[in-house]
A protein has these predicted regions:
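DNA major-groove recognition helix of helix-turn-helix/homeodomain DNA-binding modules
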Residues: 32, 46-64
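A short, Lys/Arg-rich alpha-helix, primarily the initiator
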Residues: 1-19, 57
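Short alpha-helical DNA-recognition segment
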Residues: 21-39
């Protein structure tokens, strides 16, 4: 898997979570953040750091 070089868009964050079949709270737990942090990433209020994105993809196998 090639490492991403730009933060994911809010739509990508939501699509990856939904593809993994997770709620926002459960997705946050996967990468050790609270529900509100995940909500901010999906709403576009804040950008998801690449380290969290890569960790989420690895742990949910979304990076294949």
């Amino acid at each position: 898997m090639k490492s991403p070089t730009v933060p994911p868009t809010p739509a990508q964050v939501r699509a990856a979570r939904e593809a993994a079949g997770l709620t926002q709270g459960a997705a946050g737990a996967v990468v050790h953040v609270d529900l509100r942090s995940w909500q901010r990433w999906e709403s576009g209020e804040r950008s998801m750091h690449l380290a969290y994105w890569e960790l989420f993809l690895i742990k949910t196998r979304g990076g294949k």
